[in-house]
Amino acid sequence: MLGLLLFSFHSQAAESLVFSNVWSPEAPPVASVMAGYFTVENKGRKEILIEEIRSPQFKSIEIHRTEHKDGMATMAWQPHVHVPAGKRVELKPGGKHLMMFKPKQAIKHGDTITLHVSLSNNTQQTIHAKVKRH
């Protein structure tokens, strides 16, 4: 019975973040970097940080934020994404986004990218990004 209760609690903690609209724009076949976007909602009562995102299809993935200064857009690395309790955060073009480096094979329109998301509550979620023409 205790094992069942622990499993139930662990599952609820992992499911307190709900991901939607997970996608990546198609890039040229020779591209060494692709972007990724999603909306995430925290259904829990405590803030959760997205601490790391990995994929078997890319060498590495970083979280970036687009900044505008003196008419120039630059990207700044972010150590994590804060998802406040009861709130929604959107990673979108021109804002926070994923930078997925060095795809291990060609990725094209219609493909799916597997993303393993590590969270500050010591859980991990796997989500899937659909590659779309943008």
Put a short name on every predicted segment.
Residues 1-2:
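Sec-dependent N-terminal signal peptides
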Residues 8-11:
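N-terminal signal peptide c-region/cleavage motif recognized by signal peptidases
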Residues 15-134:
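Compact, glycine-rich, soluble single-domain proteins
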